[in-house]
């Protein structure tokens, strides 16, 4: 809805930001949090994004030398009454502790009844780590982790279902880039 207060986590270069901000710019609020350096320099304050705000600027995401996944240090998102928190294709970048921190601050940022929406690349259920699946994550694992943070699982969408993706190749391979199977999950804060 155009009157929502939304928080986008890890917006990268702002591909989704450019879709979200115009929807809420007049009647709602848009906040970007965690890993916002690229959009804060190139997008925030520009035409069409004048009212968009950066929050949780003191948060840090980093990968220790030799580590497969990122860690997250944050004291919160700086918002406590959001209608929706969204994150697109980056849940897989974090290890269990980083994902737990992301889920906790998302829970804390939402008002009761608020929506937590997560989209990421599909990994086969219970498949171990390897070089080809490091940027994929098991949706069942994600559901369990997000529920453990206090959320209630509401629904999933098949919007990004790609039956031709064999779930065996790195998402950056030319043969699958842009055509990966992705899961889209919706949770609510009770």
Residue locations for each model-derived region?
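Conserved Class I S-adenosyl-L-methionine
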Residues: 129-156
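A short acidic, Gly/Pro-enriched loop at the edge of an enzyme's catalytic core
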Residues: 75-85
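A short glycine-rich, Lys/Arg-flanked "PGG" loop and its adjoining helix->strand segment in the class I
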Residues: 21-22, 100-113
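A short, conserved alpha-helix within the catalytic core of class I
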Residues: 69-72, 93-106
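Short glycine-dipeptide loop
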Residues: 2-3, 26-27, 110-116
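Core SAM-dependent methyltransferase catalytic element
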Residues: 149, 164-190
């Amino acid at each position: 809805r155009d009157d929502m207060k939304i928080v986008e986590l890890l917006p990268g270069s702002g591909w989704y930001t450019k879709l979200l901000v115009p929807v809420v710019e007049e009647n709602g609020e848009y906040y970007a949090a965690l890993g916002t350096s690229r959009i804060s320099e190139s997008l925030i304050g520009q035409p069409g994004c004048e009212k968009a705000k950066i929050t949780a600027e003191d948060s840090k995401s980093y990968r220790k030398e030799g580590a497969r996944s990122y860690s997250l240090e944050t004291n919160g998102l700086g918002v406590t009454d959001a209608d929706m928190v969204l994150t697109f294709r980056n849940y897989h970048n974090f290890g269990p502790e980083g994902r737990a921190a992301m889920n906790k601050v998302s829970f804390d940022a939402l008002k009761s009844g608020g929506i937590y929406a997560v989209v990421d690349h599909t990994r086969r259920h219970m498949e171990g780590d390897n070089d080809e699946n490091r940027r994929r994550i098991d949706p069942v694992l994600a559901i369990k982790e997000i529920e453990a943070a206090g959320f209630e699982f509401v629904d999933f969408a098949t919007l990004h279902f790609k039956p031709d993706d064999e779930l065996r190749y790195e998402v950056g391979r030319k043969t699958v880039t842009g055509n990966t199977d992705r899961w889209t999950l919706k949770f609510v804060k009770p």
